[in-house]
């Protein structure tokens, strides 16, 4: 599977030593303005939600850039301190991490350049309006190069999905088939599902129920990192679970895959890969 195997590539930035400071001046000033208390409460809630998402969804090896207050929240939530890159208010650019937590302070500091030059892709978003906090991907080559490769990136996933659908031991639901043909599925899932199908016992078949990503506010260009996977026999389902639990490095799922019942009552294995996924495969 040369085509699908070529779908994995990713670069991470370098980290710096973490140091924390108190809340920003703008946040302290807001508490004295009309409605300021409510705004502060919402700002704290948005930061906490972003920190919780980082802890539950992002690979622990990923460097994450953030302002001092946001980095403190991420550390408090459990993200490794050594992977947090603190951006002081004097930082000339937001570089240093593979992701950036774009709080209002960060958005104000870098303005429109944040998206147009450095971090074009929103992986998740919390809150709305002036208090919104976005988790953004920082591609190694910057926004222009990243956006230029998006069509090839999606086409590579489309071709990988088509190839997966030629496997007679894989039975997709209409929803899953549409997602595969639209290039919406993370390359790690494409590769893993193909491998699983080749290890099923007897005449068991792999049943693809749906692919998903529960991240709020994610860009449509972000591949789906999660899946519900069934099998035509109990032994087949057990084999799916065992295969996923045995994976390591790039193909190790985030958290433990488990068997649950889907909305129809069917037993399925749920699996999810960490963010960010391979987002530069078109240039590989």
Predicted regions and their residues:
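N-terminal export and membrane-targeting signals
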Residues: 1-9
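Extracellular/periplasmic catalytic domains that process cell-envelope and extracellular macromolecules
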Residues: 58, 92-96, 129
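Membrane-embedded, lumen/periplasm-facing catalytic core of multi-pass transferases
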Residues: 33-65
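Secreted/periplasmic proteins that engage bacterial cell-wall peptidoglycan
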Residues: 58-79, 187, 199-201
